[in-house]
Amino acid sequence: MAKLTKRMRVIREKVDATKQYDINEAIALLKELATAKFNESVDVAVNLGIDARKSDQNVRGATVLPHGTGRSVRVAVFTQGPNAEAAKAAGAELVGMEDLADQIKKGEMNFDVVIASPDAMRVVGLLGQVLGPRGLMPNPKVGTVTPNVAEAVKNAKAGQVRYRNDKNGIIHTTIGKVDFDADKLKENLEALLVALKKAKPSQAKGVYIKKVSISTTMGAGVAVDQAGLSASAN
């Protein structure tokens, strides 16, 4: 068995794995245990009551967190004409069509999000093998294929998070940085849960949001008692 580091021993002593913590207590615990030498992200894992083997029960989408994620996001947009100017005005770092595709084929991928107008998908579609494995392929379900590319750029810059359940029916995403005020982290988490509830598949039966855990990049997960969240989120 691998030897526990001093840091992990402290975390295990502080975090009761059998307990669901009030959200304020959970956030305070994360902040106390965040001793890494960088500003750790606060991540969330949401266990959903879905059968992930069935395509009609998979959950995928995007939502803008009220206080952002604390990360700067570089955006690439495939579009042309007036939309290209609108995308640039909205803050996109890279805008183009075939010229942008050529850059990507050469391995020049200095961006975090790819957005495309519908008329550009003929170009983007040829990049599936490059963008797909990196989770960058534009998709209308998460708002990255849209005629309104300027709005999509603004959303990405404002702290939009994209979510998709894994094979175990769990959503993994981020809700901010450990130096965020506790209220901001709580409100970001509540906004995410509201979005997930709106995305609930009609075929999903029983308890939908089964478990919510938050953690820092280098820390252990802390289970959150949903009763302490706003009525719309729990």
Swiss-Prot record:
GO terms for cellular component: cytosolic large ribosomal subunit. GO terms for biological process: regulation of translation; translation. Keywords: Repressor, Ribonucleoprotein, Ribosomal protein, RNA-binding, rRNA-binding, Translation regulation, tRNA-binding. It holds the Pfam family Ribosomal_L1. GO terms for molecular function: rRNA binding; structural constituent of ribosome; tRNA binding. NCBIfam families: rplA_bact (TIGR01169). Binds directly to 23S rRNA. The L1 stalk is quite mobile in the ribosome, and is involved in E site tRNA release. Belongs to the universal ribosomal protein uL1 family. Part of the 50S ribosomal subunit. This is Large ribosomal subunit protein uL1. The gene is rplA.
